[in-house]
Regions:
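Short, low-complexity, intrinsically disordered N-terminal peptides in bacterial proteins
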Residues: 1-4, 158
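Acetyl-CoA-dependent GNAT
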Residues: 10-13, 17-88, 96-111, 123, ...
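Glycine-rich phosphate-binding loop
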Residues: 93
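Short acidic/polar active-site loop segments enriched in Thr and Asp
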Residues: 115, 138
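Conserved beta-strand-loop-alpha-helix junction that forms the acyl-donor binding cleft
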Residues: 118-129, 145-149
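Conserved active-site tyrosine of GNAT-family acetyltransferases
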Residues: 132, 137
Length: 158
């Protein structure tokens, strides 16, 4: 069975939220903070986020096994976030495929065209940082949130 990538709909929201909760457990453990937004986001908030921007899901058969979402702001910055891959499928290139797919969407979107892609992750999230740098992202800033977490912002031209 192969993995297919398609646009997410409101009907996918519950599956995405469950996957998000599963995937962000390791991030919460890494930073010692289980109150992070991906673990506290409500279903209604997720549905609104999907409606406001663009979201993709990857399916293995009928199962949602990965997702990413984002939106383009008024300056032409495509803010990409919550790139998640089911733990059993991590390390097989699915995250990179999803990142490529959402970048392609924003580069040709009928709305405001993306001039740049921006995303962020925690400073200890080595796998995320490796993926983003391999995909051409460069660090453009850091912000210390608390003693355990510094957020790294990465960007690349569209």
């Amino acid at each position: 069975m192969s993995v297919t990538i398609s646009a997410a709909s409101a009907d996918d929201a519950e599956h995405i939220l469950k996957l998000q909760y599963l995937c962000y457990q390791s991030e919460a453990e890494l930073y010692g903070d289980y109150s992070i937004e991906p673990l506290t986001q409500s279903l209604d908030d997720l549905k609104a986020e999907i409606a406001r921007g663009h979201a993709l899901v990857a399916r293995l058969g009928d199962e949602v096994v990965a997702s990413v979402r984002g939106e383009v702001d008024e300056t032409g910055t495509a803010r990409i976030g919550k790139l998640i891959v089911h733990p059993r499928l991590q390390g097989h290139g699915l995250g990179g495929r999803l990142l490529d797919a959402i970048e392609q969407h924003f580069a040709r979107d009928t709305g405001p065209a993306a001039k740049r892609f921006r995303l962020f992750t925690g400073h200890r999230s080595d796998g995320n940082l490796r993926l983003y740098r391999r995909k051409g992202y460069e660090t453009v800033g850091t912000e210390r949130i608390n003693p355990r977490l510094t957020v790294v912002t990465l960007e690349k031209a569209a």
